Amino acid sequence: MVAYWRQAGLSYIRFSQICAKAVRDALKTEFKANAEKTSGTSIKTVKIKKE
């Protein structure tokens, strides 16, 4: 059995992005602001100091 998202030619990452957007769009107005804050991507890089 092949997953539906695979049959549609999507990767799992793209499928999960589409699902997350659909859930955020379906939220009530009072919860949308918090969901939009957490939907962004953030990366932190740390340089290792050699001693």
From Swiss-Prot:
Localisation: Mitochondrion; Mitochondrion inner membrane
Residues with N6-acetyllysine modification: 21, 32, 37, 44
Pfam families documented for this protein: ATP-synt_Eps
Taxonomic superkingdom: Eukaryota
UniProt-listed InterPro entries: ATP_synth_F1_esu_mt, ATP_synth_F1_esu_sf_mt
GO annotation, cellular component aspect: mitochondrial inner membrane; proton-transporting ATP synthase complex
Positions bearing N6-succinyllysine: 21, 32, 37
GO BP annotations, alphabetical order: proton motive force-driven mitochondrial ATP synthesis
Keywords attached to this entry: Acetylation, ATP synthesis, CF(1), Hydrogen ion transport, Ion transport, Membrane, Mitochondrion, Mitochondrion inner membrane, Transport
CDD domains named among the record's database cross-references: F1-ATPase_epsilon
Subunit organization: Component of the ATP synthase complex composed at least of ATP5F1A/subunit alpha, ATP5F1B/subunit beta, ATP5MC1/subunit c (homooctomer), MT-ATP6/subunit a, MT-ATP8/subunit 8, ATP5ME/subunit e, ATP5MF/subunit f, ATP5MG/subunit g, ATP5MK/subunit k, ATP5MJ/subunit j, ATP5F1C/subunit gamma, ATP5F1D/subunit delta, ATP5F1E/subunit epsilon, ATP5PF/subunit F6, ATP5PB/subunit b, ATP5PD/subunit d, ATP5PO/subunit OSCP.
Family: Belongs to the eukaryotic ATPase epsilon family.
Protein purpose: Subunit epsilon, of the mitochondrial membrane ATP synthase complex (F(1)F(0) ATP synthase or Complex V) that produces ATP from ADP in the presence of a proton gradient across the membrane which is generated by electron transport complexes of the respiratory chain. ATP synthase complex consist of a soluble F(1) head domain - the catalytic core - and a membrane F(1) domain - the membrane proton channel. These two domains are linked by a central stalk rotating inside the F(1) region and a stationary peripheral stalk.
Protein name: ATP synthase F(1) complex subunit epsilon, mitochondrial
Species assigned in the record: Rattus norvegicus (Rat)
